Amino acid sequence: MTNALVTLIVLLVTGGAPAADSAVSPVNAQAMVEKLASLEKRAKLGKPPRKVPMSVSESELNSYLNLTRGSEMPKGLSDVMVRFEQDRLMARGMLDLDQLRGRAQPIEGLDGLLGFLSGKVPVEMTGRLRIVSEGVGAFAIDDARLATVPVPVTVIEQLVVWATTSAESPKGFDIHSPFRLPYALRRVRLEPGRALLD
Protein backbone atom coordinates (compact mmCIF):
# COMPACT_ATOMS: atom_id res chain seq x y z
CA MET A 1 0.00 0.00 0.00
CA THR A 2 1.50 3.34 -0.95
CA ASN A 3 2.25 6.02 1.61
CA ALA A 4 -0.32 8.28 -0.09
CA LEU A 5 -3.11 5.77 0.45
CA VAL A 6 -2.03 5.01 4.02
CA THR A 7 -1.87 8.73 4.69
CA LEU A 8 -5.29 9.30 3.13
CA ILE A 9 -6.81 6.65 5.33
CA VAL A 10 -5.07 7.95 8.41
CA LEU A 11 -6.29 11.47 7.66
CA LEU A 12 -9.94 10.58 7.81
CA VAL A 13 -10.67 10.18 11.48
CA THR A 14 -14.23 10.73 12.93
CA GLY A 15 -16.20 10.71 16.12
CA GLY A 16 -18.75 8.02 15.30
CA ALA A 17 -18.23 4.68 17.01
CA PRO A 18 -16.74 2.09 14.65
CA ALA A 19 -19.22 -0.37 13.21
CA ALA A 20 -19.21 -3.95 14.47
CA ASP A 21 -17.45 -5.02 11.25
CA SER A 22 -14.46 -2.89 12.27
CA ALA A 23 -13.07 -5.61 14.57
CA VAL A 24 -9.32 -6.15 14.25
CA SER A 25 -8.09 -9.71 13.66
CA PRO A 26 -5.04 -11.42 12.12
CA VAL A 27 -7.31 -13.27 9.66
CA ASN A 28 -8.73 -10.00 8.35
CA ALA A 29 -5.26 -8.42 8.19
CA GLN A 30 -4.06 -11.35 6.07
CA ALA A 31 -7.11 -11.05 3.79
CA MET A 32 -6.16 -7.42 3.16
CA VAL A 33 -2.50 -8.34 2.51
CA GLU A 34 -3.66 -10.87 -0.10
CA LYS A 35 -5.99 -8.36 -1.76
CA LEU A 36 -3.23 -5.76 -1.97
CA ALA A 37 -0.79 -8.34 -3.38
CA SER A 38 -3.36 -9.21 -6.04
CA LEU A 39 -3.82 -5.54 -6.95
CA GLU A 40 -0.07 -4.96 -7.06
CA LYS A 41 0.53 -8.00 -9.28
CA ARG A 42 -2.23 -6.96 -11.65
CA ALA A 43 -0.83 -3.41 -11.88
CA LYS A 44 2.75 -4.63 -12.51
CA LEU A 45 1.58 -6.94 -15.29
CA GLY A 46 -0.41 -4.08 -16.86
CA LYS A 47 -3.59 -6.13 -16.89
CA PRO A 48 -6.85 -4.42 -17.88
CA PRO A 49 -9.17 -3.20 -15.12
CA ARG A 50 -11.05 -5.83 -13.14
CA LYS A 51 -14.53 -6.64 -14.41
CA VAL A 52 -15.84 -6.85 -10.86
CA PRO A 53 -14.66 -4.29 -8.27
CA MET A 54 -12.65 -5.63 -5.34
CA SER A 55 -14.48 -5.17 -2.04
CA VAL A 56 -12.49 -4.18 1.06
CA SER A 57 -14.32 -4.30 4.39
CA GLU A 58 -13.74 -1.96 7.31
CA SER A 59 -12.53 -4.92 9.34
CA GLU A 60 -9.94 -5.89 6.73
CA LEU A 61 -8.62 -2.35 6.47
CA ASN A 62 -8.57 -1.75 10.24
CA SER A 63 -6.83 -5.08 10.84
CA TYR A 64 -4.25 -4.32 8.15
CA LEU A 65 -3.56 -0.80 9.43
CA ASN A 66 -3.20 -1.82 13.07
CA LEU A 67 -1.62 -5.28 12.85
CA THR A 68 0.37 -5.24 9.61
CA ARG A 69 1.27 -1.58 9.15
CA GLY A 70 1.04 -0.32 12.73
CA SER A 71 4.77 0.36 12.98
CA GLU A 72 4.60 2.46 9.80
CA MET A 73 1.85 4.79 11.00
CA PRO A 74 2.74 8.48 11.15
CA LYS A 75 4.67 9.51 14.26
CA GLY A 76 2.52 9.53 17.39
CA LEU A 77 -0.61 8.06 15.74
CA SER A 78 -2.00 4.71 16.89
CA ASP A 79 -5.20 2.68 17.21
CA VAL A 80 -6.66 3.91 13.92
CA MET A 81 -10.19 2.73 13.16
CA VAL A 82 -11.79 3.54 9.81
CA ARG A 83 -15.47 3.54 8.96
CA PHE A 84 -16.96 3.77 5.48
CA GLU A 85 -20.23 5.48 4.68
CA GLN A 86 -21.76 6.48 1.36
CA ASP A 87 -19.05 8.57 -0.36
CA ARG A 88 -17.51 9.40 3.04
CA LEU A 89 -14.63 8.03 5.02
CA MET A 90 -14.40 8.43 8.77
CA ALA A 91 -11.67 7.43 11.15
CA ARG A 92 -10.59 7.76 14.72
CA GLY A 93 -7.19 7.29 16.29
CA MET A 94 -5.05 8.22 19.25
CA LEU A 95 -2.50 11.03 18.87
CA ASP A 96 0.42 11.36 21.29
CA LEU A 97 0.56 15.11 21.90
CA ASP A 98 3.83 14.79 23.80
CA GLN A 99 5.47 13.91 20.47
CA LEU A 100 4.27 17.26 19.09
CA ARG A 101 5.97 19.20 21.85
CA GLY A 102 9.49 20.29 21.15
CA ARG A 103 8.98 20.52 17.40
CA ALA A 104 11.29 22.99 15.69
CA GLN A 105 8.22 24.74 14.26
CA PRO A 106 5.12 24.77 16.48
CA ILE A 107 1.81 23.93 14.86
CA GLU A 108 -0.12 27.17 14.60
CA GLY A 109 -3.57 26.92 16.17
CA LEU A 110 -2.60 23.97 18.34
CA ASP A 111 -0.59 25.88 20.95
CA GLY A 112 -3.64 26.57 23.14
CA LEU A 113 -4.73 22.92 23.18
CA LEU A 114 -1.22 21.73 23.94
CA GLY A 115 -1.24 24.03 26.97
CA PHE A 116 -3.86 21.96 28.79
CA LEU A 117 -3.72 18.56 27.05
CA SER A 118 -0.96 15.99 27.13
CA GLY A 119 -0.33 12.34 26.43
CA LYS A 120 -2.50 10.36 24.03
CA VAL A 121 -5.81 11.95 23.06
CA PRO A 122 -8.42 10.96 20.49
CA VAL A 123 -8.17 12.58 17.08
CA GLU A 124 -11.23 12.36 14.87
CA MET A 125 -11.97 13.34 11.29
CA THR A 126 -14.56 12.87 8.64
CA GLY A 127 -14.19 13.70 5.00
CA ARG A 128 -15.10 12.95 1.43
CA LEU A 129 -13.04 11.12 -1.14
CA ARG A 130 -13.82 12.11 -4.69
CA ILE A 131 -12.39 10.94 -7.96
CA VAL A 132 -11.11 13.97 -9.88
CA SER A 133 -10.36 11.99 -13.03
CA GLU A 134 -9.70 8.35 -13.83
CA GLY A 135 -7.02 7.18 -11.41
CA VAL A 136 -6.79 10.48 -9.51
CA GLY A 137 -8.45 11.19 -6.17
CA ALA A 138 -8.81 14.18 -3.87
CA PHE A 139 -9.89 14.51 -0.27
CA ALA A 140 -11.90 17.18 1.52
CA ILE A 141 -12.11 17.32 5.31
CA ASP A 142 -15.59 18.05 6.66
CA ASP A 143 -14.84 17.95 10.39
CA ALA A 144 -11.79 17.46 12.60
CA ARG A 145 -11.52 17.15 16.38
CA LEU A 146 -8.74 16.72 18.87
CA ALA A 147 -9.89 15.42 22.27
CA THR A 148 -13.47 16.27 21.15
CA VAL A 149 -12.49 19.93 20.55
CA PRO A 150 -13.13 21.12 16.96
CA VAL A 151 -9.89 22.16 15.26
CA PRO A 152 -9.42 24.16 12.06
CA VAL A 153 -8.48 22.30 8.88
CA THR A 154 -5.21 24.28 8.83
CA VAL A 155 -4.15 22.51 12.04
CA ILE A 156 -4.87 19.13 10.44
CA GLU A 157 -2.90 20.19 7.35
CA GLN A 158 0.12 20.96 9.51
CA LEU A 159 -0.24 17.74 11.54
CA VAL A 160 -0.37 15.67 8.36
CA VAL A 161 2.68 17.39 6.85
CA TRP A 162 4.57 16.88 10.11
CA ALA A 163 3.54 13.23 10.39
CA THR A 164 4.31 12.34 6.76
CA THR A 165 7.61 14.14 6.23
CA SER A 166 10.34 11.64 5.38
CA ALA A 167 13.51 11.30 3.32
CA GLU A 168 11.47 10.19 0.31
CA SER A 169 8.84 12.89 0.91
CA PRO A 170 10.64 15.89 2.48
CA LYS A 171 7.59 18.18 2.15
CA GLY A 172 5.15 15.65 3.57
CA PHE A 173 1.69 14.98 2.20
CA ASP A 174 -0.53 17.89 1.13
CA ILE A 175 -4.09 16.84 1.92
CA HIS A 176 -5.55 19.31 -0.58
CA SER A 177 -3.56 18.13 -3.60
CA PRO A 178 -5.04 15.52 -5.90
CA PHE A 179 -3.12 12.23 -5.77
CA ARG A 180 -2.70 9.22 -8.02
CA LEU A 181 -4.56 6.17 -6.75
CA PRO A 182 -2.23 3.23 -6.07
CA TYR A 183 -2.10 -0.03 -8.02
CA ALA A 184 -3.34 1.61 -11.24
CA LEU A 185 -6.83 1.83 -9.72
CA ARG A 186 -9.28 3.89 -11.74
CA ARG A 187 -11.58 4.74 -8.86
CA VAL A 188 -12.57 3.99 -5.28
CA ARG A 189 -16.23 3.99 -4.27
CA LEU A 190 -17.21 4.16 -0.62
CA GLU A 191 -20.34 2.45 0.66
CA PRO A 192 -21.53 1.68 4.18
CA GLY A 193 -19.08 -0.86 5.59
CA ARG A 194 -16.88 -1.28 2.52
CA ALA A 195 -14.80 0.31 -0.21
CA LEU A 196 -15.06 -0.88 -3.81
CA LEU A 197 -11.81 -0.72 -5.77
CA ASP A 198 -11.99 -0.57 -9.58
What are these regions (language model features)?
Residues 15-198:
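Extracellular/lumenal and peripheral-membrane lipid-interaction modules
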